[in-house]
C-alpha cells in the first residue's frame, strides 16, 4: 500500500561550528523534551507509534560555515528518513526504488539505500564501528550532505548524523559518550557494547519498560548491558533518554489478584 507523506511537526536548528560538549548535551536534552508526549519517572516518552495515521516527522537543520543541510526524522521512532541538500529544494529519501512503498516525503527522489544501518553501512562501504563520531566528523557530514552526490560520502554522513542525533536522543550513555569526546582531535568510535547492548534493543527495551509499567502481571526478563545484569524495568529505564511507545504496550493489563 502507498504510504502517506510525512507531516513536519517542528524544526530545530544547530550550528555545528560553535558546538561544544555542553551545548551538544543541552541540544539533545531539549530535543527529548520537544519530542515527549508524557514522562515515565522523568524519562520522556514518544508519541504513540501509529502506522495508520499520517506519519509525523521533524526537521533538523544543520549548518556549518554557510553550508546547510536539513534532515527529516520520523517522530514516532526517530529513524532518519531523508535530507535536503543545500539550496536544492528537492528532498532525498532513504528508500530503494525497488521497495515500492511510495514516498514518505512528498516529491522526494529515492536514494539507492534504505534507512537501516545495514543498508547505510553497505552503501558507505564502512562498518558503523569504524566511523568517527566527533565535531570534526559532524562538520564533514554537514558539508558532504550539503553538496556531495557521492553515494559513499552521503551514506557515511547520514550514519554520523543518525548516531549523533537519533541514537544519542535514545540513549543516555551514547549522548554522554559523544558529548565527552566531541572536541577530541582523534577519531571517536562507537564502543561495540553500545551498538550490541543498547542500539539493537531500543524498541524491545521500550516495550519491556512500558509493558511493565502498564501490566502488573508482566514478567520482566533480566537483561545484560555492558556485562551488568539489569533486573527491573526501572533499572532499565535509566539507560534510555527517550522511550518508544508501541501500541501493544497499551493492551489492557491482566486481571491482577
Curated annotation (Swiss-Prot):
SUPFAM superfamilies to which the protein is assigned, alphabetical: Ribosome inactivating proteins (RIP)
Pfam families linked to this entry: RIP (PF00161)
InterPro entries given in the database record: Ribosome-inact_prot_sf, Ribosome_inactivat_1/2, Ribosome_inactivat_prot, Ribosome_inactivat_prot_sub1, Ribosome_inactivat_prot_sub2
Active site annotation, chain numbering: 167
Record-annotated disulphide pairs: 217-254
GO annotation (BP), single: negative regulation of translation
Single GO molecular function: rRNA N-glycosylase activity
Keywords: Disulfide bond, Hydrolase, Plant defense, Protein synthesis inhibitor, Toxin
Nuclease in keyword set: no
EC number: 3.2.2.22
Hydrolase recorded as keyword: yes
Top-rank taxon: Eukaryota
Sites marked Important for catalytic activity: 79, 117, 170
Substrates-to-products reaction catalysed: Endohydrolysis of the N-glycosidic bond at one specific adenosine on the 28S rRNA
Stored PANTHER family: ALBUMIN B-32 (PTHR33453:SF9), PTHR33453
Family: Belongs to the ribosome-inactivating protein family. Type 1 RIP subfamily.
Function description: Inhibits translation in rabbit reticulocytes.
Name assigned to this protein: Ribosome-inactivating protein charybdin
Source species: Drimia maritima (Sea squill)
